[in-house]
């Protein structure tokens, strides 16, 4: 099918790039090759063209280099696994997928490796160790819970594929908010910038609303950029396709609606931010850092989508050899 055109998306937040971007690019293959996460030449080329180093450098512009390297490797792990969930035979095997996820959660919670563990498990052991050298266990437990939510979303998508279901709009939005993984990458902004927001903020209803809106903004922009590839491959998990299918409108009209939804969400984010008011200077500093991380991810993700070739190619992956 023809490449769907991507109209302008509203984003008032400035582009920023971490000063270590060039060094990170040089480093970017080191970790994934050490753990043999790229199964073949095709996966190698796909990884290089995806430019995850640019996403990390754009989404975490103020991070120190060691934290940036670890975060880049987390992003690499998630995206490589995400391809297995979406493009390999696992995409229609929710039970198998769930078994993998349960084991990954055990690893993240401290379980030791066995002879049956996969390359992905071995990589997670390394990520856990390196992360906990620089982060508190309290923060890491939050991070694990966000990854668990991401895993849940991936399994729900696989269930729909196995049953041949096109989810209704409300169901799709619920699943997408999990499968996009934004809560986990926002938590990494705390890690990269060496702070942890206090519980009084993390549990505040307006902060939760900001997180939800940020999740939607990133989800809908990604759906716009990935629409051509996903629709051509027969994947129904895209807001453009869901609107096209259930509202019986053209794909072009559906794109216009998603762009409109995205832009309205950006305005909503700014409006909610303006309503925030806390009672101590310390809390104001912490929430400002966290909101800055949201802005960096929204802009960084958008810049990366334009720069990366991740969503430009249509291909089917062979299942990674789990040895």
From Swiss-Prot:
CDD domains: Terpene_cyclase_nonplant_C1
Motif interval(s): DDXXD motif: 82-86
Top EC class, one word: lyase
Assigned keywords, A-Z: Lyase, Magnesium, Metal-binding
Cross-referenced InterPro entries: Isoprenoid_synthase_dom_sf, Terpene_cyclase-like_2
E.C. no: 4.2.3.90
Required cofactor names: Mg(2+)
Residues bound to Mg(2+) 3: 222, 226, 230
Keyword Magnesium: yes
Chain sites annotated for binding Mg(2+) 2: 82, 86
Name listed for the protein in its UniProt record: Germacrene A synthase
